Structure formats: structure tokens, C-alpha cells
Amino acid sequence: MAEDDLESLPGVGPATADKLVESGYDSYQSIAVASPGELSNKADIGSSTASDIINAARDAADVGGFETGSMVLERRQQIGKLSWQIDEVDELLGGGLETQSITEVYGEFGAGKSQITHQLAVNVQLPPEQGGLGGGCIFIDSEDTFRPERIDDMVRGLEDEALEATLDDREMEGSIDDEETIKALVDDFLDKIHVAKAFNSNHQILLAEKAKELAGEHEDTEWPVRLLCVDSLTAHFRAEYVGRGELAERQQKLNKHLHDLMRIGDLFNTGILVTNQVSSNPDSYFGDPTQPIGGNILGHTSTFRIYLRKSKGDKRIVRLVDAPNLADGEAIMRVQDAGLKPE
């Protein structure tokens, strides 16, 4: 959105428009979904002025009013579904990972949560006819789990048809049987994954803001950001805020972080995939004592909640625990050297 457009909002002159753009609010829509306190702090303007600007931006962007159910249905046609390339899992999830939503995957260590983030960082780059979204990926890494070598394995592990279609889509010459061609393709996949390591919870929150800027820069390019992975969402919050005395502050910061991520999904039609750690409830005498970290804040904010469990060997059980429009259920997949594969 051009700066002159922002100046048409009440109370926005050239100086204020500059502050808004510098703070990442360069469109009506990005201003419309901001809170008055957030806009006031980042753009250094009064809270009353910020409220007026936000209300005017909502009118200009047609955001925040009531819609009919049919209008919502029409808008939902724009939502993308990212295939896991595993029919059983895709069927469980109603077609795959949904954009404009937060999908949480939780499970014990070694269950394969990071493997899912790597695989979907590859799959999102596939052409739509192959189940991808033809877009790039942002990867916020809080546990030092991102491995380029794993991306290499998973690209090579794609079906021949998907590899051929990807070469054509990127207008790359060569054969999938040629090692130099595959190396070049792997490099091209890696170039479209933007990785940042989060050193603590404050840095992780800052990286979400940077991710919004990066997604905005790529919005009108050939490779828009269609997937944002956070692996893991809760590790730093869990380590830094210990005990009941700090629980309220932890949950407040986690809540803000989740809403920042959701905003990216809404603004840029991006799928948000977060992994979560678990704890064991010693008071549970019946059923599975494994519980996800994050409490009700994360439970309410996640649109889709997946519990990943180990089974025999390389088998993993993908259990859909919560979804607004899908029944609970399970699917089985395998975690192999070539990536995630059907049973």
C-alpha cells in the first residue's frame, strides 16, 4: 500500500505515515488488525489517535463488520490446503494443513514433530497440482532443530512425478536421474526456506514480528510465504517462566505471541504450524497422562490440535484431538530417511 493512501486516514500526516511504514504498518489491513496499544507504542502516537486510525483503516479495508454465512463460505474458498503427501493423514485433516489457521503438533521427544516441520517446509513448495501451495516457508527455530541435510533427504525422497512437476514449475533443465540437477533443486528448495534461531522468548516474539515483515516483502512475488513453522513454540517460555508465581506473565506473553502468528496467517494466507512439548500428569490414573504445555491459552488459540505418538519402529500415530469442523480420529505414518511416508 502506498504511503499516500495512509495519509488519507484521519490524523495521519506525512510524518505519522512514515512512522507507520517504518513500524511495518504499510497497508490498511495491517493497521486494521492492530490493537490501539500496539500501534501507539510502535508508531509513537497517542492511544486516542491510534484508535481513530484503526477504526478508519477498518472501514477502508472492510474489516471487522458482520458477514453472512454465505460470505464467510465464499471467503473460505481462498484458504489453501497443504498436503502431507500421505493420503490417510490428509483425509484425517480434511485435505491437509490449512492456511489462515494455527495447527499445533504435540508429543514426547523423538515422536517426529520436527520431522513434520521439515517435511511440510518441502511440501509447501510443490506446485498446487502436486498438493503444495507454490510458496516459501519461514522457520523459527527455538531448539536448534533445523537441518538442511534433512531437507536434502526429503527432496530426494519425493515421488518422481512430484520431482518432474517441480522441475517444470521452476523452469529448471535436466533430469531427475541426474545428480547435478537434483543438487541444484535441493539448493533451490533451501533458498525458499527462511530460518531464524530464537535465543529466548523475547527474541522469539521479535522474530514473529520480523516474519510478518518478511511475509509482506514476498506477498506479491512469485514465491509468497505460505507456511510459518515454529519449532518449538513453548520451549523458551517453559524454561524462563518457572513456578506458579510466573505462570500469569508466561501465559500473557504466550497469548500475544500466538495472536501475532495468527495475524500473519490471516494477512498473508499462510499456514501456521507450531510444535509443542508435553508433560506427564502423575495424578492421572486412567488414560494417557501426557498433556501439552501451554494450558488453555494454547488450547483455545490452536485451530487444529494433533497429538503425535510413537508406535513400533518407524511408525507414528497422528491423532486429531481438536478441530472446528472435523471429527477426532487417527492416521498412521512412517518417519523414514526419505521423509514422512504412508504406512
From Swiss-Prot:
Q: Which InterPro entries match?
A: AAA+_ATPase (IPR003593), DNA_recomb/repair_Rad51_C (IPR013632), DNA_recomb/repair_RadA (IPR011938), DNA_recomb/repair_RecA-like (IPR016467), DNA_repair_Rad51/TF_NusA_a-hlx (IPR010995), Hlx-hairpin-Hlx_DNA-bd_motif (IPR003583), P-loop_NTPase (IPR027417), RecA_ATP-bd (IPR020588)
Q: Which Gene Ontology BP annotations are present?
A: DNA recombination; DNA repair
Say which domain of life the source belongs to: Archaea
Q: Does the keyword ATP-binding apply?
A: yes
**Listed GO MF terms:** ATP binding; ATP hydrolysis activity; ATP-dependent DNA damage sensor activity; damaged DNA binding
Q: Where does ATP bind?
A: G107, E108, F109, G110, A111, G112, K113, S114
One Pfam family hit: Rad51
The record's section on SUPFAM superfamilies has:
P-loop containing nucleoside triphosphate hydrolases, Rad51 N-terminal domain-like
Q: What happens when the gene is disrupted?
A: Decreased growth rate, loss of homologous recombination, increased sensitivity to DNA damaging agents such as UV light and ethylmethane sulfonate (EMS). Loss of maintenance and/or replication of pHH1 and pHV2 (but not pHK2) replicon-containing plasmids.
Q: Does the keyword Repressor apply?
A: no
| UniProt entry keywords in alphabetical sequence | ATP-binding, DNA damage, DNA recombination, DNA-binding, Nucleotide-binding
Q: Per its database record, what is this protein's job?
A: Involved in DNA repair and in homologous recombination. Binds and assembles on single-stranded DNA to form a nucleoprotein filament. Hydrolyzes ATP in a ssDNA-dependent manner and promotes DNA strand exchange between homologous DNA molecules. In addition to its role in homologous recombination plays a critical role in maintenance and/or replication of some plasmids, but not in plasmid transformation.
The Swiss-Prot or TrEMBL record describes its family as follows: Belongs to the eukaryotic RecA-like protein family.
Q: Which named protein is this?
A: DNA repair and recombination protein RadA
